[in-house]
Amino acid sequence: MPSFRKELEKKDLEILDLFTISFSIFRYNFFNFFLIAMICGIPIILTTAYFPPTILDPLKIQTFEDFINWFKNEVNEGFYINTFLSWFLDIISILSISFLVEVMINKKIRTAFWAIKKSVKVILPAIITSFIYMIIVFFGLAFFIIPGLIFVVLFMFTNNICALRHTWGIDAIKYSASLIKPKFFKALFMLSFIVFFENVFIISFPSAPADTREGLLYYFLSRVLLYLFDTYFKIIIALFFLNRDFVSNSQKLDFD
C-alpha cells in the first residue's frame, strides 16, 4: 500500500483526487471498513424494522408551529429510539473511520476493533461537541434556513477534529470553520453530491411491501449497501480534513 501523506501535505487536492485516494484506502482495508459499517449499521437496521419511526412529511410542515405540533402529536417511540441510536453510532463510525484513515495514509493497517476502542476513549467529548453542533444548526435551520445549511458545511470536520486533534466543544467547531472557509464551495459541492447520491440510491433501489419476505430482504440489502457507501463517503471527508489541516498548518509555518 502506498503512502499518501506527502500528497496530502503538498497542496489542496482536487475533488476527483480525494475520491480516488479514498477509494484506494477503502479497497486496501475493505474488511475492517466493512466491519465498522456493519457494527454501526446493523443495530439501526434492526431497530428501524422492529420500531418503525414516524416519518416527517415536509409538505405538511409550513411553519415552525407546524413542526412543534407534529413533534407533540405524531412522533412515536420508534422515532426517539432510532434518532438517538443513529446519532450515537454515527459518531462512533466517524471517529473510527478517522482513526483508520489517519494511520493508513502512513502505510499502516489497523483493525476495526482497534479503531472502535480508540473511539470509545474520546466518545464523551465528541458527544458534547455534537450536541453543541446540533443546537447551532437547529437554530440556524429553524429561523433562517440558509445560515443553518451554511453551518452544516462549515462544521463538517467537527467529529474528525475530536478524533484526530484532541480538540472538542466550541474549539473544535471553530477549528472546522477555519479549515472550511477557504474551500467552502468545494465542501458544499461534496456534501451536496453525497446527500444527492444517497437519496437517489434509496429511491431507485427495488422495493416491496414491508410485511413480506421480499420487502424485508430488499430493505436489509439496501441498508447494508447504503452503509457501505456512507463509510466510503466518511473516508472522503476524513481525507479532506487531513488534507486541509496539513496544507493550512504548512501555510502558517511558511508565513511565520
Model-flagged regions — what are they?
Residues 1-10, 21, 57-70, 93, ...:
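Juxtamembrane transition segments at transmembrane-helix termini in multipass membrane proteins
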Residues 34, 88, 92, 147-150, ...:
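Residue-level signal for the membrane-embedded core of alpha-helical transmembrane segments
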Residues 84-123, 127:
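Hydrophobic alpha-helical segments and helix pairs
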Residues 64-89:
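Membrane-embedded or membrane-proximal helical elements that form or frame transporter/channel pores
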Residues 29, 33, 75, 79, ...:
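Residue-level signature of transmembrane alpha-helical entry/exit and packing/kink sites
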Residues 13-43, 113-139, 151-202:
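Interfacial aromatic "cap" segments that immediately flank transmembrane helices
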Residues 81-88, 142-146, 159, 220-229:
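Hydrophobic alpha-helical transmembrane segments of multi-pass membrane proteins
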Residues 41-55:
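Alpha-helical transmembrane segments of multi-pass membrane proteins
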